[in-house]
Structures are given as structure tokens and as C-alpha cells.
């Protein structure tokens, strides 16, 4: 599964001298037990456990905390993209100004991924090896510059998300404007 790719990459990044906390937050809670078996030493949020200083992994298998996790993160690796599932929607990550790494499977949200990559907020990696390389680049930037990517890139991505969120309202207005006007008898 995808989590094995992430866990292996995380171990390699730690060995390269970049300690970090990998938080795996499954999109579907029914996957928590399978993921927990892959990382038996990790604290589990569903058991009211929190990671300790020096822990490398944490299973955030709770509901309603994703935006808090993303806000606290220096980098997000978006799932559903290292296996042929099409990638999860990257707009929430971009809206919270967090640098994003994604795998190659992006067919569900291709336009959003392409646009965020143009703004420099998102990077696509092809496999675990290129994930390790990109993580070490951004973690080194965090270490030396205090940020993985320039704030200007994050600001541009945020502006794009704001425009994207306006799309449904604009579409609804176009539809409503084309509806025939009916006269109701008094």
C-alpha cells in the first residue's frame, strides 16, 4: 500500500540526517487498523495518544482534525497519488499555505495539481526514491531558510484556491440567469 512507500521514504530521510515526524492521516477511518500494523510503535490519535519528542511516526486516525494537522505541518505529502487512485483534492492544502508533494496519479484533480505546480506550491514525484530526494531538498531549505518554498509561491496558490472556490457560485449564477422567468398569478 501507499503507506509503505511513505514509511520507507521517511526512514531514508531520517538516515540522511533529517529527523522529522511523519503523520499519516487516513482519508477513511476503516483503514486505520491496517496502517497501524505497518507502524506498531507509533502513537494513535484515536487512542488519545500523542507523539513524543523524537518519535518519527504518528497515526492521526481521528475525524475533523485535518486542517489543524495541515496548518501545523511544514510539508504535506498528499495521498491517493502514489497508487492509481487519482490523488486527493489538493485545494485544502493550498488554502492553508502548506507546501505539497504528490505522487504521479492525479487524474481526479489534474487541473488543480497542474496549476499549483505552476505556482510552485506543489511538486510531483514519481516514486519513493524521488520522494526522498524532494523531502531532503525541502527539509534542508527549512533548516537553512526557515521555509521549504518561497512565501510568494504559497500566496499565489492561495489566491488560486480562492478563485477555485468561487467557481460553483459563478456556475450557479449562470444557470439561474438562463432559467425562464415565470409569472405567478396573484
Task: Give the ranges of each region predicted by the language model.
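Nucleotide-activated sugar donor-binding and catalytic core shared by glycosyltransferases
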Residues: 1-186
Amino acid at each position: 500500500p501507499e503507506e509503505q512507500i511513505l514509511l520507507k521514504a521517511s526512514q531514508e530521510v531520517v538516515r540522511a540526517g533529517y529527523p522529522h515526524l511523519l503523520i499519516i492521516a487516513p482519508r477513511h477511518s476503516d483503514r486505520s487498523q491496517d496502517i497501524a500494523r505497518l507502524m506498531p510503535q507509533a502513537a494513535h490519535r484515536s487512542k488519545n495518544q500523542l507523539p513524543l519528542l523524537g518519535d518519527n511516526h504518528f497515526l492521526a486516525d481521528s475525524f475533523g482534525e485535518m486542517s489543524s494537522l495541515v496548518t501545523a505541518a511544514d510539508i504535506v505529502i498528499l495521498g491517493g497519488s502514489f497508487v492509481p487512485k487519482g490523488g486527493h483534492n489538493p485545494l485544502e492544502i493550498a488554502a492553508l499555505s502548506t507546501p505539497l508533494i504528490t505522487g504521479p496519479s492525479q487524474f481526479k484533480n489534474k487541473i488543480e495539481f497542474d496549476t499549483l505546480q505552476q505556482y510552485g506550491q506543489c511538486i510531483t514525484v514519481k516514486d519513493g526514491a524521488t520522494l526522498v530526494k524532494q523531502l531532503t531538498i525541502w527539509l534542508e531549505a527549512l533548516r537553512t531558510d526557515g521555509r521549504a518554498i518561497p512565501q510568494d509561491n504559497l500566496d499565489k496558490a492561495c489566491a488560486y484556491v480562492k478563485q477555485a472556490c468561487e467557481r460553483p457560485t459563478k456556475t450557479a449564477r449562470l444557470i439561474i440567469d438562463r432559467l425562464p422567468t415565470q409569472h405567478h398569478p396573484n
